[in-house]
């Protein structure tokens, strides 16, 4: 098998693994109350950093580039909204929307060389444009799908580790609920979709610093001259940025809550598992980026998890119901599949 064929095989297999894991990594959290998500964010990011540390040791500790941490900071900022998104519009629809905008941002920045990156060329540019255009259509389609989310998805026996002393349980129950739980049904969809769009754009920018370093490593006059071309060498710096940023946000949250944050013990192990799944998926994505290039891997890996998450939402959690929604979902699936295939074949 030729080197090019090996790269393509490795890239597409890594993409498939990343799609499956990204589409399922929030599933362990669905049955547990996670409050406003700030504590969960920190637990999840701690697990991500630990997995990245293991990978870094396996790779014999490649050079640490601090600028690569910026991508992790961007990702952690977008990830703050995950719990509110899932609580307002559901797991399936949330991942579908943020995945679509993730796709467009990542594809456009790689294809056109935004933020100082080198523009990436493909052998069939028209097919690549069609694939990206179909991602836009799928994103618009998802906005018309209505999800059904219960007001209190957490179990009734879930209680925070740290809350105000309870004198009147009836009055304090509403006080203990997060701002998301207190939103009226009217605002659920507006808030959820808006946050999903913002998160998607931030997610789509997360690899920009790494690609920037790789592109400038080929220039002798650059401070990044000689930097590694292997994407996985940057996973530890990327994850360190994630953990550092989430820690800063969590400390700020504790200060804002006057040192009485809402910590949910039942969410700790599911949060760690979710972080491990996400970290493994990200490592697969880094491998796919190296084997296929970001302009190919981004549209495939960012569009695919929505299909997996939607299946979880339809078959297991019953978030999406009704013939109209099922038909729209099937249409969106077909559009995503067509877009992913166009993108994949644009490099062949």
UniProtKB/Swiss-Prot annotation:
PANTHER family: TRANSMEMBRANE PROTEIN 144
Keywords: Membrane, Transmembrane, Transmembrane helix
Keyword flag Iron-sulfur: no
Protein's membrane topology: Multi-pass membrane protein
Name of the featured protein: Transmembrane protein 144
InterPro entries associated with the record: Sugar_transport (IPR010651), TMEM144 (IPR012435)
Cellular location(s): Membrane
Main location: membrane
One GO location term (cellular component): membrane
GO molecular function: carbohydrate transmembrane transporter activity
TM stretches of this protein: 8-28, 39-59, 64-86, 93-115, 125-145, 193-213, 235-255, 267-287, 296-316, 326-346
Family membership: Belongs to the TMEM144 family.
Signal peptide: none
Gene: Tmem144
Organism of this sequence: Mus musculus (Mouse)
SUPFAM superfamilies linked to this entry: Multidrug resistance efflux transporter EmrE (SSF103481)
Keyword Ligase: no
